[in-house]
């Protein structure tokens, strides 16, 4: 599922392969949306880390049930009221809101979304280009 309310898979662009400063590759999907748009859990899992600072700004890490994959949500404006570390989330749960924290341009609100194979460290796994796997539009769970 697209992790931003109201965004269809056809609206996603290839930001995964874009170059960044220092010769690095982005290796994530940026999803543009209005500031404050709900950010949704793309898949079920457990929130393992909430962080605020650095390049990602306000961030959420969600591990899947197997512990093999981690979803990373960055540049959030803030967390949903119920969000805390250890919380089990289901696909479509509101977990935060699109923003511009961290190194995001202040006039370009977006969600920086990344899925990683959880290698030695949850925050530094092997990134996966998830666009081929995102087949459902972002819709809040009732």
Named regions from a protein language model:
Residues 1-58, 91, 100, 128-142:
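Surface-exposed, glycine-biased beta-strand/turn segments
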Residues 61, 69, 87-142:
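Conserved, short, structured surface segments that act as functional micro-motifs
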């Amino acid at each position: 599922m697209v992790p931003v309310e109201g965004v269809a898979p056809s609206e996603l662009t290839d930001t995964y392969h874009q170059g960044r400063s220092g010769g690095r590759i982005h290796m994530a999907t940026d999803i543009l949306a209005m500031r404050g748009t709900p950010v949704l859990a793309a898949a079920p899992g457990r929130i393992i880390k909430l962080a605020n600072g650095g390049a990602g700004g306000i961030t959420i890490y969600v591990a899947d049930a197997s512990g093999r994959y981690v979803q990373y949500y960055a540049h959030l404006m803030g967390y949903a009221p119920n969000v805390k570390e250890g919380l089990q989330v289901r696909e479509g749960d509101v977990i935060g809101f699109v923003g511009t924290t961290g190194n995001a341009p202040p006039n370009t609100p977006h969600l920086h979304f990344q899925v990683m194979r959880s290698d030695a460290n949850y925050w530094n796994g092997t990134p996966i280009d998830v666009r081929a796997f995102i087949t459902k539009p972002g819709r809040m769970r009732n």
